[in-house]
Regions:
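Phosphate-binding/switch region of NTP-binding enzymes
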Residues: 97
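Mg2+-dependent endonuclease catalytic cores in nucleic-acid-processing enzymes, primarily RNase H-like
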Residues: 1-89
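Generic structural signal for bulky hydrophobic/aromatic residues embedded
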Residues: 62, 103-104
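P-loop NTPase catalytic core of nucleic-acid-dependent motor ATPases
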Residues: 100
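Acidic two-metal-ion nuclease catalytic site recognized across multiple nuclease folds
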Residues: 104-119
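Short glycine/threonine-rich catalytic loop with a Thr-x-Gly-x-Asp
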Residues: 93-94
Length: 119
């Protein structure tokens, strides 16, 4: 499955999602250009100059404070892979879900009115 296919699929699966964040590097600009006309809410995000490890560390206090909730794997079995990647970071072969989590937590904590972020 390509990144375009994945974004299209997730957009169909979660039509209530207002923003779809796409990293503005590598093939991200081409994806943004292609999907912006097709899917509402496509937004570029920049990783900035910090390392992936530093970006992940910047949101760890939100997790440590108990302000992020994820579905139990019993109800959402697909969460297992994501949790494994988060917990095993940076020693996992893939870490795209870590980036996605960082962008989501940063965006939601900037906009959150209350202390709880629900996923």
């Amino acid at each position: 499955e390509t990144a375009l296919d994945a974004i299209r699929s997730m957009s169909r699966l979660y039509p209530e999602a207002i923003a779809k964040l796409v990293e503005d590097k590598a093939n991200g600009p081409a994806i943004i250009d292609t999907l912006r006309r097709e899917i509402t809410g496509i937004m570029p995000v920049s990783p900035g100059a910090d390392s992936k490890e530093a970006r992940a560390a910047s949101v760890s206090p939100v997790f440590e404070a108990g302000q992020v909730f994820v579905p139990h794997p019993r109800w959402k079995p697909e969460i297992e892979d994501m949790l494994e990647e988060w917990i095993g970071f940076p020693n996992m072969p893939h870490d795209d879900n870590v980036d996605s989590m960082v962008y989501a937590v940063r965006k939601l904590t900037r906009r959150a009115k209350g202390p709880v972020i629900r996923f």
